[in-house]
Amino acid sequence: MIPKLIVFGGNGFLGKRICQEAVTSGYQVVSVSRSGKAPHSNELNDKQWMQEVQWTAADIFKPDSYHELLNNATNVVHSLGILLENENYKQTLSKSPTYDSKSRLLSFGAGPNPLKKSSPYFTYEMMNKQSAIILADTFKQKILKKSKKEQEKANQRSFTYISADKGFPLIPSGYINSKREAEIELEKMQRYFRPIIVRPGFMFDEHRNAIGPRSFIHTALELLYCGNKFLLRNKLQLLNDLIRPTVSTQQVSKSVLKNIENPDFKGVVTLEEILKA
């Protein structure tokens, strides 16, 4: 029987690479997102694996829109979340470098325009925490409908949550706090599935062109990390905690699949462990 992997946020920056790695590993892959569309890509390699994925639309806050997808599901991945409670920041990260985008980058921590109506769901509490809890609870309810014998096979099921290594400078503490709070709730469900908590740092994609604000941040963080490592020899713990290595979405994806396929693993996957994948 071909193993099935359902990725919520599967057309996102990291989610699509998890889908790609899963397809390569022989999984039947279902991507769930609001649009239900495959991500745009001009790369031939991307177009090939994308044809193997079932792209589906659903609202994670409305279990009725996706609960049937969880029938007989053994592995679920939550790859949703926000870094800022500002609905425009993801567009800023993905745009080509311009004076305007760099200016907005410098005011990255600024809140949303108070005159602009925003989604009530676009908060740390809802996107980073509640969306994961709602999905995990829906998965749990499906498991409870199985026979007692099947319910006891928790090690054969997994729920992967993409958390974060640490908070980032200029980013509100609500970001990392919401991630940690979600982790605590998911770990309470070990009776039903293996909670896999993945904690990457700032991510970049190995195959995307090195342009745009995300590339600007990646380069700056790499310079800081190398300076701390080779010039200061990592002697200052305060800097070690603040300046962390970046990690590619491909490395994170390999780590996710590696731990999903290990029936004995549950718990936290640190940034250091991800970098070894």
UniProtKB/Swiss-Prot annotation:
Keyword hit for Mitochondrion: yes
Function text: Component of MIOREX complexes, large expressome-like assemblies of ribosomes with factors involved in all the steps of post-transcriptional gene expression. Component of a multi-subunit COQ enzyme complex required for coenzyme Q biosynthesis.
GO CC terms: mitochondrion
Keyword Protein biosynthesis: no
One BP term from GO: ubiquinone biosynthetic process
Gene that specifies this protein: COQ11
PANTHER family the record matches: MIOREX COMPLEX COMPONENT 2 (PTHR12126:SF16), NADH-UBIQUINONE OXIDOREDUCTASE 39 KDA SUBUNIT-RELATED (PTHR12126)
Lineage of source species: Eukaryota, Fungi, Dikarya, Ascomycota, Saccharomycotina
Subunit note: Associates with the mitochondrial ribosome. Component of a multi-subunit COQ enzyme complex.
Disruption outcome: Shows impaired de novo coenzyme Q biosynthesis.
Family recorded in the similarity comment: Belongs to the NAD(P)-dependent epimerase/dehydratase family.
Alphabetized UniProt keyword annotations: Mitochondrion, Ubiquinone biosynthesis
Note, other: Present with 1470 molecules/cell in log phase SD medium.
GO MF, one annotated term: protein-containing complex binding
Record protein name field: MIOREX complex component 2
Domain of life: Eukaryota
Pathway: Cofactor biosynthesis; ubiquinone biosynthesis
Localization, UniProt: Mitochondrion
Any Pfam family hit: Epimerase
